[in-house]
Amino acid sequence: MCDIYHWGLIAFIVGILFLCVFMLSCGYFLGGCSSSRSKNVPFESGIKSIGNARIQFSVKFYLIAMFFVIFDVEGIYVYAWAISVRDVGWIGFSEIFIFIFILLVSLIYLIRIGMFDWIEQSSRHVHCVDFFDIDTSRYLKKSNKR
């Protein structure tokens, strides 16, 4: 059934699970937990905060950070390929070419759907004036109401 080489992997997984359960249970039993009104107030560097400390950020910041991480990790793969370019030959070159092509297609797709535009879709088209529209006063009245 189990080869002798698999016992090391099984012991490693069991050891990691035991260590995780042990650390979580130690934190639960040894750590004190008390709630009061003053513990729910944000506090930094000995200075009481003025106003609300919970600032809402736009989702765009999160998306840009995720895109950066994704493209940065893929840059590591390209760097690893660049180090071993002589060893992998033309097969490695074609694989990295396909990989970079997929990256560029995904980047173009993200640009086309407007993921890098900081202006919202509804407000982006309000300021565009159609040059073929004869009655622009009607357009200006509508845009001033918003």
Curated annotation (Swiss-Prot):
Give me the disulphide-bonded residues: none
Query: Ribonucleoprotein: present as a keyword of the record?
Result: no
The protein's UniProt keywords, in alphabetical order, are: Cell inner membrane, Cell membrane, Membrane, NAD, Quinone, Translocase, Transmembrane, Transmembrane helix, Transport, Ubiquinone
* Compartment(s) of residence: Cell inner membrane
Q: Which GO terms describe its cellular component?
A: NADH dehydrogenase complex; plasma membrane
**MF terms per GO, please?**
NADH dehydrogenase (ubiquinone) activity; NADH:ubiquinone reductase (non-electrogenic) activity; quinone binding
* A family per Pfam: Oxidored_q4
Q: How does it sit in the membrane?
A: Multi-pass membrane protein
Q: What is its EC number?
A: 7.1.1.-
| Reaction catalysis annotation | a quinone + NADH + 5 H(+)(in) = a quinol + NAD(+) + 4 H(+)(out)
Membrane-spanning regions, if any? 4-24, 63-83, 91-111
- Leading EC class: translocase
Oligomeric and partner information: NDH-1 is composed of 13 different subunits. Subunits NuoA, H, J, K, L, M, N constitute the membrane sector of the complex.
Q: What does this protein do?
A: NDH-1 shuttles electrons from NADH, via FMN and iron-sulfur (Fe-S) centers, to quinones in the respiratory chain. The immediate electron acceptor for the enzyme in this species is believed to be ubiquinone. Couples the redox reaction to proton translocation (for every two electrons transferred, four hydrogen ions are translocated across the cytoplasmic membrane), and thus conserves the redox energy in a proton gradient.
Regarding protein family, the annotation reads:
Belongs to the complex I subunit 3 family.
Q: What is this protein called?
A: NADH-quinone oxidoreductase subunit A
Q: Gene name on record? A: nuoA
